[in-house]
């Protein structure tokens, strides 16, 4: 198998740019979410009753550590509804105040084609996600798994969401094919995906999170349908690489470049 040539290695190294505030913030969020998942795993094996207490009827009777977790999770969605200035442009691009129209006139037909292609890909992702989670839903409804397992699954998705943003996203690589998260058509679908397992648990904790996530999703889709020009780099120069201030692709892009070269070398070797 061929080795990656030195010029290619230099190209991979040169992808890295100075860390931005957004990148550092999201790395901290990844660590924080990882700690929450570890705590949930610990509770699952050591004190499962405490984990299940999130979805019990006494959740609203007293204020304790469970409500702090709930507030943190809810806050994570509220900042996407507003949206807050410190989150990535991947979410904020839906707002009018982040839209920058190009000086040269863009092709409306090309924008329309972009919308059509991205919509088809987006609903493929939705279909795959619903089918995948339908497996857990059936297991839950037949009593094979319970509330604790569904909560743990949701916390796993909670971490996976940030991994998709910073490190690797299978939906981006295999289906959407967008060049980065800032340009992602389904960026604000994340919370809906995170809390999908909670739909099947009848409690204030689970349903408040799931249906708030639905509001985030619906808001995103309404804006996308009304103002698609905000979501395409050809009609919104804010989304172009040279204007990016987030730089949250610092890990993902070098990995993509490395994977591309390895794949090419494997193909050349098999010829």
Per-range role (PLM):
Residues 167-192:
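Membrane-helix boundary/juxtamembrane motif in polytopic membrane proteins
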Residues 18-73, 120-139:
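Long, highly hydrophobic alpha-helical transmembrane signal-anchor segments
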Residues 189-206:
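Hydrophobic alpha-helical transmembrane segments in multi-pass integral membrane proteins
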Residues 33-46, 58-93, 141-144, 151, ...:
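Hydrophobic alpha-helical membrane-embedded segments
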Residues 226-271:
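Short, highly charged, low-complexity non-transmembrane loops/tails of multi-pass membrane proteins
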Residues 82-95, 167-174, 220-238:
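Juxtamembrane/interface segments at transmembrane-helix termini
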Residues 2-45, 94-110, 177-183:
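Cytosolic-side membrane-entry/anchor segment at the start of a transmembrane helix
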Residues 79-122, 265:
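Charge-rich cytosolic interhelical loops and cytosolic tails of multi-pass membrane proteins
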């Amino acid at each position: 198998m061929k080795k990656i040539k030195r010029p290619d290695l230099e190209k991979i190294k040169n992808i890295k740019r100075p860390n931005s505030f957004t990148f550092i913030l999201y790395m901290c969020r990844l660590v924080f979410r990882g700690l929450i998942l570890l705590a949930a795993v610990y509770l699952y094996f050591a004190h499962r009753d405490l984990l299940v207490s999130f979805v019990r009827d006494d959740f609203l009777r007293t204020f304790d550590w469970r409500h702090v977790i709930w507030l943190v999770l809810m806050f994570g969605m509220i900042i996407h509804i507003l949206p807050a200035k410190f989150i990535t442009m991947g979410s904020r691009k839906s707002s009018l105040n982040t839209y920058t129209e190009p000086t040269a006139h863009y092709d409306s037909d090309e924008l329309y084609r972009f919308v059509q292609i991205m919509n088809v890909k987006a609903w493929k992702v939705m279909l795959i996600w619903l089918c995948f989670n339908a497996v857990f839903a059936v297991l839950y409804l037949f009593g094979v798994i319970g509330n604790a397992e569904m909560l743990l699954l949701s916390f796993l998705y909670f971490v996976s969401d940030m991994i998709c943003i910073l490190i690797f996203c299978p939906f981006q690589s295999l289906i959407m094919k967008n060049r980065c998260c800032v340009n992602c058509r389904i960026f604000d679908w994340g919370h809906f995906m995170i809390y999908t397992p909670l739909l099947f648990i009848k409690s204030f904790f689970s349903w408040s999170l799931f249906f708030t996530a639905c509001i985030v999703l619906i808001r995103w889709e309404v804006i996308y349908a009304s103002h698609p020009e905000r979501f395409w780099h050809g009609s919104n120069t804010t989304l172009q690489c040279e204007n990016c201030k987030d730089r949250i692709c610092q890990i993902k892009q070098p990995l993509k470049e490395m994977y591309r070269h390895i794949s090419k070398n494997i193909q050349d070797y098999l010829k």
